[in-house]
Amino acid sequence: MEEINREEFQEVVVNIGRVTKVVKGGRRFRFNALVVVGNKNGLVGFGLGKAKEVPDAIKKAVDDAFKNLIHVTIKGTTIAHDIEHKYNASRILLKPASEGTGVIAGGSTRPIVELAGIKDILTKSLGSNNPYNVVRATFDALAKIKA
């Protein structure tokens, strides 16, 4: 695979989580970040980073996202066909839309679809709204699209 130029990618933080560990002296906080990166030209990836500070968690998540890049097949401004995918308790439904419809997506699905470069799509998130599971379900669905 050719070398990837990180400058042409945009990144979006989908979720920041705080985890608390209670110790004898009080509470210890740690953070995790779920980040999506994409070049709006079919390449998109997501990553999870964990650290004691939020900026460090985001940086780790971005590095992880570049290791998990996938290529999304785009037909014109939309996807080629309907697809439904389930990951754990989250189900995602993706449907192609006619030109001019725009991105109709909510929550964690919108940044993925936009950063992939899809301009017209209808999406529906069913079941669990856990951000990580919705992102995984969306990625798996986009990876399964055939031209």
Swiss-Prot record:
* InterPro entries hit by this protein: Ribosomal_Su5_D2-typ_SF, Ribosomal_uS5, Ribosomal_uS5_bac-type, Ribosomal_uS5_C, Ribosomal_uS5_N, Ribosomal_uS5_N_CS, Ribsml_uS5_D2-typ_fold_subgr
Q: Does the keyword Ribosomal protein apply?
A: yes
Instruction: Give one GO biological process term.
Output: translation
Outline the extent of the S5 DRBM domain.
Answer: 9-72
Task: Name the Pfam families for this protein.
Answer: Ribosomal_S5, Ribosomal_S5_C
Q: Which GO terms describe its molecular function?
A: rRNA binding; structural constituent of ribosome
Give the record's family classification: Belongs to the universal ribosomal protein uS5 family.
According to UniProt, the name of this protein is Small ribosomal subunit protein uS5
